[in-house]
């Protein structure tokens, strides 16, 4: 039993280290926007939802257009977000873009978390 706990602890440590390296939160992204840091924000939600509201400066790249890689940049961090915490679309997009050689992070909680934090929404 002790071996299992030690094994789980090591796996948990690695999981959370990886999670922190490849995810960021809405408040952190908002600060990056305010400071005009060089990041690309990619909204992978559908175009109708994007038009209803999105993160300032975000580029809409819905799933049917992922193959174009439109808006992604190789020289900076690309931050991906989708609908909400339980939406895995952002993670799938991030994995696909990383496979193509792009530096990526995913925004925790998606657009829903952005709204819940009362951050600026552009229409």
Over which residues does each language-model region extend?
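Flexible, polar/low-complexity N-terminal or interdomain linker segments that lie immediately upstream
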Residues: 1-41, 45-49, 123
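Short, structured coil segments at secondary-structure junctions
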Residues: 54-56, 100
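Short, hinge-like loop/turn segments at secondary-structure boundaries
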Residues: 59, 77, 121-123
């Amino acid at each position: 039993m002790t071996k299992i706990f030690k094994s789980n602890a090591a796996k948990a440590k690695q999981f959370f280290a990886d999670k922190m390296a490849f995810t960021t939160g809405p408040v952190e992204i908002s600060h990056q926007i305010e400071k005009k840091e060089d990041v690309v924000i990619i909204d992978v939600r559908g175009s109708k939802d994007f038009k209803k509201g999105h993160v300032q400066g975000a580029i809409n790249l819905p799933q049917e257009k992922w193959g174009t890689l439109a808006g992604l940049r190789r020289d900076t961090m690309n931050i991906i977000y989708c609908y909400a915490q339980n939406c895995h679309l952002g993670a799938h997009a991030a994995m696909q873009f990383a496979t193509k050689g792009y530096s990526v992070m995913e925004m925790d909680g998606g657009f829903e978390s952005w709204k819940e934090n009362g951050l600026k929404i552009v229409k």
